[in-house]
Amino acid sequence: MFKEKKAPLVCKFGGTSVGTSSSIQRVCEIIRKEKPSFVVVSAVAGVTDLLEEFCRAPVGQKSQFTAMIREKHESIAKELGIDVAIEPFLGPLKQFEGAGHLQQEDQAKILAIGEDLSASLICSYCRANSLQLEQLEARQVILTDSQFLRAEPDLALMQTMWGELVLKENTIYLMQGFLGATASGATTVLGRGGSDFSASLVGELCEARELRIYTDVRGVHTADPKILKDTQLIDFLTFEEMQELASSGSKVLHQDMLKPCIRAKVPIFVTSTFDLTKEGTWICASLNEGVEGPEIKALSLKANQALWFVEYHSPLMRLENVLRCVRGLGSIPGVVMAQNSGVYFTVDWEENNQSMTEALREFGAVSCEGPVSLVALVGAKLTSWSMTGVFDALQGTPVLYWSQTDTVINLIINEESGVVVTKLLHDYVLGLNRSGL
């Protein structure tokens, strides 16, 4: 492993940033100008969805998804004027076109194809335009356990292997996001949105000076600009604030990707691939000296949630055991609200939740309500925030449950009220900010 005189810059480009030939050209321009040490890329926009459809499709219908994936990449390559061998990457698809049920290990091989293809396209185009990149194979860097579809990185093993890599100075390395491998070499994936996680792990390994996330928005906004029109760009967020937003519905960053950056103290800058203003949001351990944000900085909305409550049958029950049980069933707890008598938590709603109910009965009486929406107000020093104004802003909209910590106020409401409540609270927060309260 080399040590640069200047700490490395890691750049990550999401699916929308590599979704068309013109966007790939833009990515090449950014790489040429910024000269990052490491570039991590997602699959072409929409391709992971097609690969998931392939895995679910019955025998006889899988081949249509193979054809769509082939056509999408061949079309981009043609528009870019490059010659890329697409067919070798499609081998696992052809292999399983006649298969019914796919094992998780086989699904991981299939889902990884998207990033393998996009990395090949981008590397070929950059080289064709006199920008020399070296490909860094993710399966040799992101080493994981054998939970094939939501693998956990083995950080100790990764650090050992990273130290043994022979990397050249003054070289740009391009790596696939989202995927990794077990110690024995079997392909694994990190779960949807896992390319962010891959990039943050690389940032931790190389002790990066900055992790720059390029996406289709300029940064983190006061609410999702795809839901509300009058959102504002946030200049700075702490890691803790971004963690709350990510766990409660914000789609800007993957929930797990913050942990490596927190451990290694790597600041994150979120910006747009397509906006030439270079505006964005800094996410770091603490706000820059002299910068004071509003008490409530942002809102997030997470729809189609289930609100579970486990009322402990013994005071010896432990929260971590409940959450371990939930994760063992393949669900990811979003908001967790602990009480002395039990715990409330949210996960994605499923009509058939019998297996979750039966598993949780080990800890106490179980109830579930859903589907519901979760609206979170994220900021700083919120334990002292008066809830009167929040409830007044809701204009009588029923709240099923709410909780308040130093960094987040969580509201559980009826599913159909999610967007309306987000708009009402966003107007309330912006009004306070404008008045300086």
UniProtKB/Swiss-Prot annotation:
Disulfide pattern: none
Origin superkingdom: Bacteria
Keywords for the protein's UniProt record, in alphabetical order: Amino-acid biosynthesis, ATP-binding, Diaminopimelate biosynthesis, Kinase, Lysine biosynthesis, Nucleotide-binding, Transferase
Enzyme Commission number: 2.7.2.4
CDD domains referenced in this protein's UniProt entry, alphabetically: AAK_AK-HSDH-like (cd04243)
One Gene Ontology term, aspect cellular component: cytosol
Keyword Kinase: yes
GO molecular function: aspartate kinase activity; ATP binding
GO biological process: diaminopimelate biosynthetic process; homoserine biosynthetic process; lysine biosynthetic process via diaminopimelate; threonine biosynthetic process
Family matches, as InterPro entries: AceGlu_kinase-like_sf, Asp/Glu/Uridylate_kinase, Asp_kinase, AsparK_Bifunc_asparK/hSer_DH, Aspartate_kinase_CS
Short name of one Pfam family: AA_kinase
Pathway: Amino-acid biosynthesis; L-lysine biosynthesis via DAP pathway; (S)-tetrahydrodipicolinate from L-aspartate: step 1/4; Amino-acid biosynthesis; L-methionine biosynthesis via de novo pathway; L-homoserine from L-aspartate: step 1/3; Amino-acid biosynthesis; L-threonine biosynthesis; L-threonine from L-aspartate: step 1/5
Keyword Transcription: no
Similarity section: Belongs to the aspartokinase family.
Listed name of the protein: Aspartokinase
